[in-house]
Amino acid sequence: MQQVYVYDAVRTPFAKLGGGLAKVRPDDLAANVIQAMVERYPNLDQSKIDEVVFGNANGAGEENRNVARMASLLAGLPTSVPGLTVNRLCASSLDAAIHASYSIGSGDNNLVLTGGTESMSRAPYVVPKPERAYPAGSSQMVSTTLGWRLINPKMPEEWTVSLGEATEQLVDKYQVSRERQDEYAVLSHQRAHAAWEAGHFDNLVVPVGDAKRDETIRPESTVETLSNLRTVFRKENGTVTAGNASPMNDGAAAVLLGSEQASQTLGADPLVRIASRGVAANEPQYFGEAPVPAANLALERAGITWDQVGAIELNEAFAAQVLVNLDSWGIELNDERVNAWGGAIALGHPLGASGSRVLGTLARRLKAENRRWGVAALCVGVGQGVAMVVENEDATE
C-alpha cells in the first residue's frame, strides 16, 4: 500500500436552517466547493482527477440520488471524471475520504476529490405510495430533514427513539450534568468566534453569494444564559437544549486527497498523511458512545496513544456526547487539543458535510499549531462511529 495524503481543504460557510444558503440546492453547494478547490490549481489538468467521492445523508430530493456525479458535472469537471456518493449519515464525508484513501493506497487512483454536502433547509417531505390504487384514506407526509423516517415496524422501539431522546438516555447512563453540557457549549462558541477573529478560516471558507461566515456562532453565550433555555426532548428531568446541541444547517465541504506522486500533479505539498481509520458500532440508541471504540481502533492501527495526539476534531452532535467521549478517553472538558477552532455546536452540523469539515480543519490545525498527530471522529445515528488518524510529517514538536 502506498501512502495517502490530504493536500487541501475548503468549505462553504455553514448557514442556519432557513438562513443564507436556504435558496441554494445541495448539488450547487457541492459544485461550489469543487470549483473552489480546482481553481486553486490553475495548472491542473482536471482529467487527472481520478474520481469525485462525496458524502450526503439525505439523498431524498435535489441531491438526485448521486449528488457527487451531479455536482461534478455542474462544477464543469470533465465528463470522464466518475462520481460516487456514500452515506453513513453524519460521518458520510469522512467515509468518502476513507473510501478514497483505500483507492489511492491500493494504487488504483492518484488524485481524488472528496467532500460532502447537505441542505437541511431544502430537505423534502416524502409521502409513501399506497399499497393499493385509489385509496379512500389519507397518507402521512414525512419530513426528511433529520432522523428516522418510514421506520420498519420490525425494529425494536428502543432503537428508534429520536436523537435527542437517545442523548438523554446517554446522559442517564453516564450521569452527565446539564451544567457541564452548557459549559462545553459555551466553550465551543468562544473558540469558534476566536478562530474567525484570528483568521484561521480565511483560507478554508469560501463565500457562496452573500453568505461569507458561519451563521450559528454566538460568542455572547454564557452558562447562565444557556441554563435558562427549556429542555427540548424531556419536559421533566431533561438536560438537552437548543443551546447544548448542534443546530441544523446547510453547507458543503471538500478535501483533496492524493498519493505522494500527486504532489507533482498539483504542484503542491501535502498537509498531512492519513495514518489509519477506524469504524465501530454499538447499540443504536447509544450512538453517542460509538466514537470511542472507533477512535481507539484507529489509534491502535496507527500505533500511537492518546498521549501522543496533539489535535482532536470531534464532531459535536450534542455536548453530552462529546463529554461522554472525552471522559472515556480521560481527556478534560477544556483540553486545548479538542476542537480548538470551535465545533459543530457553534459552527453548525450540515450532516453529510461535517466529516469533511472535521478532517479539513484537523489538517489545517496540525500545520498551524506544529503538532504531529491528529484524530478526527464523528458519532453516527443508529449506533456507529467513524474516526481517522492523520500525521503532520513536518511537525517539529
Question: Whereabouts are the PLM-identified features?
Answer:
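Active-site pocket-lining segment
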Residues: 165-168, 201-204, 211, 275-346
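Conserved catalytic cysteine-centered active-site region
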Residues: 24, 56-112, 144-145, 158-162, ...
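Flexible glycine-/small-residue-enriched beta->alpha junction loops
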Residues: 111-169
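Condensing-enzyme catalytic core mediating Claisen C-C bond formation in acyl metabolism
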Residues: 1-24, 146, 224-289, 293, ...
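Active-site-proximal alpha-helical scaffold in enzymes
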Residues: 88-118, 171-200, 254-261, 327, ...
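Short, well-ordered amphipathic alpha-helical segments that serve as non-catalytic structural scaffolds
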Residues: 27-41, 67-71, 96, 163-170, ...
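Conserved beta-ketoacyl condensing-enzyme motif
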Residues: 22-112, 117-135, 205-214, 285, ...
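N-terminal extracellular/periplasmic Venus flytrap/periplasmic-binding protein-like
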Residues: 11-12, 23-32, 43, 180-265, ...
